[in-house]
From Swiss-Prot:
Subcellular location: Endoplasmic reticulum membrane; Microsome membrane
Species, as recorded: Cuscuta reflexa (Southern Asian dodder)
Protein name from the UniProt record: Cytochrome b5
UniProt lineage: Eukaryota, Viridiplantae, Streptophyta, Embryophyta, Tracheophyta
InterPro entries documented for this protein: Cyt_B5-like_heme/steroid-bd, Cyt_B5-like_heme/steroid_sf, Cyt_B5_heme-BS, Cytochrome_b5
Membrane topology: Single-pass membrane protein
Domain Cytochrome b5 heme-binding: 4-80
Length: 135
């Protein structure tokens, strides 16, 4: 494996140009400058992964064992993990199944609909009953 020097992410970030390109993958720092032109995905893929932890980018592709072996030759040191920002994931806030504040409003609206409907039904029933009894 390559050198044992420890770099900060700020130091690695200074190497993000086509003529000087370093990547952080799996806690190691790699100088991939000479490989930019030979990379099957093109130089832009590697350049877009500079100045950050590119481990997820690398693993998502599913590189071959020969690609991983090539990395050993490009290793220039380790990354100081305390300089890499922690990944935050979005966790939606927990909400009740119903909005407790709006439940009374829902009941009021339901009653505003049902009470006139019941009154109308009773009025029609009384009229129908009176019509039947008069015949």
């Amino acid at each position: 494996m390559g050198g044992s020097k420890v770099y900060s992410l700020a130091e690695v970030s200074e190497h993000s140009q086509p003529n000087d390109c370093w990547l952080v993958i799996g806690g190691k720092v790699y100088d991939v400058t000479k490989f930019l032109d030979d990379h099957p995905g093109g130089a832009d893929v590697l350049l877009s992964s500079t100045a950050k932890d590119a481990t997820d980018d690398f693993e998502d592709i599913g590189h071959s064992s020969s690609a991983r072996a090539m990395m050993d030759e490009m290793c220039v040191g380790d990354i100081d993990s305390s300089t890499i920002p922690t990944k935050t994931s979005y966790t939606p806030p927990k909400q009740p199944l119903y909005n407790q504040d709006k439940t009374p409003q829902f009941i009021i609206k339901l009653l505003q609909f049902l009470v006139p409907l019941i009154i109308l039904g009773v009025a029609v029933g009384i009229r129908f009953y009176k019509k039947q009894s008069s015949d």
